[in-house]
Amino acid sequence: MDGDFQSNYLAAEQAYGAGDFETAQSITVELLNQLEPLPEEGAERDAVLAWRAFVALLAGHIDLYGFQAPDQAESHYQLVLASHPQDTLRELAEQGLERIRSDRESVTRSTQATDPGE
C-alpha cells in the first residue's frame, strides 16, 4: 500500500478520535473499497489482508461506538477475523463482537422482563 493509503487511514483514525464519525466512516469505506479485489497470493495479498484487518477494525469501532450500529459493526468485525489478523487485532475484533452479543442479550432480557405476555 502506498503512502496516501496510510495517510488516509491515519486521517480516519484522527477523525474517529475527534468524534467526527461521518468523516471517519467515509474514509474507511473508501479505503476498504481500495483493497478490493483481494490479490490471489503472495506478499501483496498478505499486505492487503493486514490493511483490511486494520481498516475493518476501525470501521467496526466507528459503527459500534460512534453510530451505535451493531449490525454494521458486526460485519466489519467479522471481516477483521476473515483477514486472519495478528493476535491483537483478532482479540479487539472478538471483544467488539462480544460487546454486541452482550448488548443484544441485555436488550432481550430487558424486553422479556417488561413484557408480561411472555
Question: Each predicted region: which residue ranges?
Answer:
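Short coil/turn linking the two alpha-helices of tandem helical-hairpin repeats
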Residues: 13, 17-20, 39, 64-68, ...
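Residue-level signature for tetratricopeptide repeat
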Residues: 10, 14, 18, 62-63, ...
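Flexible helix-coil transition and linker loops at the boundaries of alpha-helical arrays
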Residues: 34-49, 66, 83-90
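Inward-facing hydrophobic residues that define packing positions of alpha-helical scaffold repeats
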Residues: 9, 16, 28-31, 35, ...
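Alpha-helical linker/edge segments of TPR/alpha-solenoid repeat scaffolds
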Residues: 50-68, 97-118
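Structural signature of alpha-solenoid helical repeat junctions
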Residues: 3, 44-52, 69-72, 89-92, ...
